[in-house]
A protein has these predicted regions:
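Catalytic P-loop NTPase motifs of RecA-like helicase/translocase cores
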Residues: 259, 440-441
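Charged, often flexible domain-edge or linker segments that flank or initiate folded functional domains
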Residues: 1-140, 179-422
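Short loop/turn segments at strand-loop or loop-helix junctions that form parts
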Residues: 169-172, 291, 435-438
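Active-site loop signature of alpha/beta-hydrolase-fold enzymes
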Residues: 176, 294, 440
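Generic alpha-helical secondary structure signal
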Residues: 164-169, 191, 195, 219, ...
Length: 441
């Protein structure tokens, strides 16, 4: 387990490390023994609510190659939810030293990611697979549980931001992937073409880029971030430029939801002071996606000289989504467009209360088409989409609206923001691509 000397901050609080976090919050800790049965009871209460059962099914879809009983699957899901809650709270205390009040409103903003978006960290926490505590019947009890965890965390100083802080907890609670063996996880040939392979031997230089396509809890990524940051700042680079260039240079993905949550948290902590003061909006370049197979182009959607279209499975029977290449190639465009959709989804739901469902859907699709086809000055994506790309996005949006009307959750947006990562990562050239991660489960 990574470990460093525990220190004390100027405020007199202990600066935790990976080992002390395991001691305080690991499987043998009083904190876990109190939180786990409460979380499990809350889940049992709402697991048949459609949006909760959907998140659980989607999470289960990422557990490929593992044969567990239904009881063991639920137990693991609750344990991973526990660690994901800790990650959110640690990140909040890293970015804001003020105490967490315990109010439901504040804790909800931490759980669903609104707090981090207000800090200009757009995608750190999305409406992911661990936000089931937002379900109204358990929201207040879930917030009380988070407040108890926050009170336990308040004894520590997280401002220093030890990057591998949560790695030990991840190793304790997350099962080792069946894909990993003593030989590590080989890099698929289609992605190896994106850059020189690196067998975790050396860290990138200040001007080199690195991709870790099986990033696990992010140990190699955060080491790369630290090396690039130190080298750039030592040679006098501007802090804003350093932040933006690091985010472009060090990127990763993983097919395990908790791994991505921990890797993003570790990446955030590794950025340190670059994100603790004012900075422009940023995306943390760690994505929930897999690389076992190349991205699939849907030839049936492509007509003549039209643009390429990629198909993404949902994990639900018969449900697939299509994204035009111009959107799939651009993580900023992905985040921006899908980040606008919650307003349209809610609008469709509100319209159905006063008009025919099909009329409501078409009205919202017309409004979104107008947005896609119009110039968007003073935004990250000022140019309108082509007519063909807009049509593809509208078909996907219609599917999302119909899903939302049945199960009002934004979890699909989380999936679709992340799934195209192999597309936009494969089309650029990284200086180094990590082809083994046997040291990082």
């Amino acid at each position: 387990m990574p470990d460093g000397p525990s220190a004390h901050s100027h405020a007199g609080k202990e600066v935790p490390n990976a080992r002390s976090m395991v001691s305080a919050f690991g499987p043998d800790s009083p904190a876990f023994h109190q939180a786990y049965p409460e979380l499990l009871a809350l889940f049992q209460h709402v697991k048949d609510v459609p949006e909760v059962s959907l998140r659980f099914r989607l999470w289960r879809g990422y557990q490929l190659g593992v044969d567990r009983s239904p009881e063991d699957e639920e137990a693991l899901y609750i344990k991973e939810t526990y660690v994901a809650l800790l990650a959110r709270l640690v990140a909040r205390l890293f970015l804001d030293v003020s105490p967490i009040t315990g109010e439901v409103t504040e804790l909800t903003k931490i759980l669903e990611g609104e707090f981090f978006q207000a800090q200009n960290i757009t995608n750190f926490i999305e409406d992911d697979l661990f936000t089931w505590l937002l379900c109204p019947p358990v929201l207040n009890q879930g917030a009380a549980l988070m407040a108890t965890l926050a009170a336990s965390l308040s004894h520590y100083d997280f401002v220093i931001g030890v990057p591998d802080l949560l790695t030990g907890l991840y190793e304790e609670f997350a099962p080792r992937s069946p894909e990993i063996n003593a030989d590590g996880n080989p890099l698929p040939g289609w992605l190896a073409q994106s850059g020189m392979t690196n067998d975790i031997g050396s860290l990138p230089g200040p001007d080199q880029s690195v991709l870790d396509p099986h990033c696990g809890s992010g140990q190699f990524l955060v080491a790369a971030v630290g090396a690039i940051k130190q080298a750039r700042l030592e040679r006098g680079d501007d802090t804003y430029d350093t932040l933006l260039l690091i985010l472009d240079q060090a990127q990763g993905m993983d097919s395990r939801p908790l791994a991505v949550t921990i890797a993003r948290t570790s990446y955030l902590l590794a950025l340190g002071g670059l994100v603790q003061s004012f900075h422009p909006p940023v995306l943390l370049p760690v994505y929930l996606s897999g690389v076992a197979t190349p991205p699939v182009r849907d030839l049936e959607q492509e007509r003549g000289d039209s643009e390429p279209v990629y198909e993404f499975g949902s994990g639900e029977p018969g449900e697939v989504f299509h994204i035009p290449e111009i959107v799939a190639h651009d993580p900023v465009m992905l985040d921006w467009l899908f980040g606008r959709l919650p307003n349209y989804l809610r609008g469709a739901l509100l319209r159905t209360r006063g008009q025919d469902t099909e009329d409501a859907i078409q009205a919202v699709l017309t409004a979104f088409h107008n947005y896609l086809a119009a110039p968007k000055p003073r935004t990250p994506i000022p140019d309108p989409l082509s007519r063909f790309a807009a049509e593809v996005m509208l078909k996907t949006t219609e599917s999302l609206i119909r899903l939302y009307l049945n199960q009002p959750t934004n979890v699909w947006l989380h999936i679709l923001k992340n799934a195209p990562a192999p597309v936009h990562m494969a089309q650029r050239k990284f200086d180094l691509v990590v082809d083994r991660f046997s040291a990082d489960p």
